[in-house]
Amino acid sequence: MSCKRHPGFGEKLTIRSVPVHNGFVMEASQDHHPSTSSRIGATGSSTGVGERQRERIIRAATLVFSRKGYDGARVEEIARSAGIPKGNVLYYFKTKKTLYRVVIEQVLSLWLDALGNIAVDGNPEEAIRQYVNRKLALSRNYPEASRLFAMEVISGAPVINDHLSGELRLWVEEKGEVFRKWQQDGLMAKIDPAHAFFMIWVVTQTYADFEAQIQAVTGAKGYDQEIYTDATGDVVEALVRGLGLKRDT
C-alpha cells in the first residue's frame, strides 16, 4: 500500500535500508534516540524555503497535538512552537484539521513501511523478527507520534476513520495474503492475519503509549537503552512463538 503524499512529506527515507516515505527521516536502531522535534517532518535533504517551512510546521504540530489532542491544540501554539507566524501555518495547511490529518497519516505511513517488502517466498520468522524490531525502535524514537495516533484511535478516529477503513484495511488484506500462504505451507500458525497485526501493533506500541506505566513499574528514568534492550528480545520471541513462525527450509 502506498499512502498518499501531502505537502511537507519527504521523498526517500530509510529505516535500516527499508524505504520509508512521507516526511520522516530516521535510523531505527535501538541505540539511537533522536529528539522527535528535530527529526519528524524532516526530509534529510536540501529543500526550498517553502518545503522547510512545511517540515518545521509538521514537527511542531506533532508535539503539540500529542500533548493537547486535536481539540486542545491551537494553531497559535503550533505556530509558536515552530517559531513562525500563525498566518504561515494556515498558508501551507488551510485548516487545523488538514494539518492534523497530515501528521497522523505520516505516523501511519512510517509504521506500515517498516514492514518492508515481505513475500510468500521469503523467510517468515526473519521477516517478522525484523518488523517487530523496527516497530519497537519507532516506539522508542518517536513516542509522541505513537501517542498521538493512539489518542486519535481511542477517540473513535473522527479525522482519519476513512483512511483506516480504506488504505489501512487494504494494506492489511494485501499483507494478509502473504500470511495465509505461509499458513498453508505450515510456516505460521493459523491466526487471522488482521489479528496477527493487531497483536504486533499493541505489543510494540505500548512501550510508547504507556511510557509512564513502564517507567513506574521498572523504575527506569526516561527511555534508557536497558529498557529496550531487555524488551526487544522478549517481545520478539513471544510474538515469533505465539504466531508459530518458522524458517522456510
PLM region spans:
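Short hydrophobic clusters on alpha-helical segments that form packing/core surfaces
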Residues: 53, 57-65, 135, 239
